[in-house]
Swiss-Prot record:
GO terms for cellular component: cytosol. It comes from the Bacteria. Its EC number is 2.1.1.170. GO terms for molecular function: rRNA (guanine-N7-)-methyltransferase activity. S-adenosyl-L-methionine binds at residues 85, 90, 155. This is Ribosomal RNA small subunit methyltransferase G. HAMAP family: 16SrRNA_methyltr_G. InterPro entries: rRNA_ssu_MeTfrase_G (IPR003682), SAM-dependent_MTases_sf (IPR029063). Transmembrane segments: none annotated. It is an enzyme of class 2 (transferase). Specifically methylates the N7 position of guanine in position 527 of 16S rRNA.
Length: 234
């Protein structure tokens, strides 16, 4: 659980944004405490390690935290999650903070950057989030989780066609994929159909703007005889 003695109010410039985010995606007091601890840590590390775009800091809660939390409503029964390229912790650490209240809930956070992986480990330690950090390329870490994951996620990591290639072994074993995408979602869907057969469900982001969530439940290669394309390492 988040260390309440270390909890401090959000900076004044973020207070209104936090309130707006929690109106969009309400959470328990315990999860809010974990998220407060996470945001405070992220702001400390941001000064020395570029975890998120500085231009988005004024909307950290709505642009990043709420954007991540909204995935939970699309997979309410999912217990085990796998987050590709967790980076600064969106959505992985946010999900771990929320799932800490769920019996058996956990997130595996895959990140190949050593500094970012160190931040993710510290974030899980400080918040008490339910998760584990895996320092590896996505393509090198997927097969071990086939049949063990309920939901796979990714945000600002790779084009959709590559994400599908990585996630296919998990989806084949029953996992749902939820990929957060932006204004180029139509172009990415068009490109992905060149390699994959799939029927996506598109959900507009609760945070507004041009964000979308691509939900996938079944995928197959366009050419069944060709090797499964995994794309470049990420």
């Amino acid at each position: 659980m988040a260390q309440r003695s270390q909890k401090s109010p959000p900076p004044p410039e973020l207070a209104a944004d936090k309130a707006a985010a929690l109106r969009l995606t309400p959470v328990s007091r315990e999860t809010e405490a974990r998220l407060d601890a996470y945001v405070a840590l992220l702001l400390q590390w941001q000064a020395k390690t570029n975890l998120i775009s500085p231009a988005t800091l004024p909307q950290l809660w709505t642009r990043h935290v709420a954007d991540s939390l909204q995935l939970l409503r699309l997979a309410p029964d999912a217990k085990t999650w796998l987050d590709f390229g967790s980076g600064g912790g969106f959505p992985g650490v946010v999900l771990a903070c929320a799932l800490a209240e769920s019996a058996g809930g956990s997130v595996q956070l895959v990140e190949r950057n050593v500094k970012k992986a160190a931040f993710l480990r510290e974030a899980l330690r400080v918040t008490g989030g339910a998760g584990q950090v895996i320092l590896a390329d996505i393509g090198d870490s997927v097969d071990r989780f086939a049949g063990q994951v309920d939901c796979v996620t990714a945000r600002a990591v790779a084009p959709l066609h590559q994400l599908i290639g990585f996630a296919k072994p998990l989806i084949r074993q029953g996992a749902k994929a939820l990929f957060l995408k932006g204004q180029d979602v139509d172009a990415e869907l068009t490109e992905a159909t060149k390699s994959w057969k799939f029927s996506p469900r598109l959900h507009p982001s609760l945070t507004g703007g041009q964000g979308w969530i691509v939900e996938l439940g079944a995928v197959e290669p366009q050419d069944q005889s060709a090797p499964t394309p995994h794309g470049a390492s990420v």
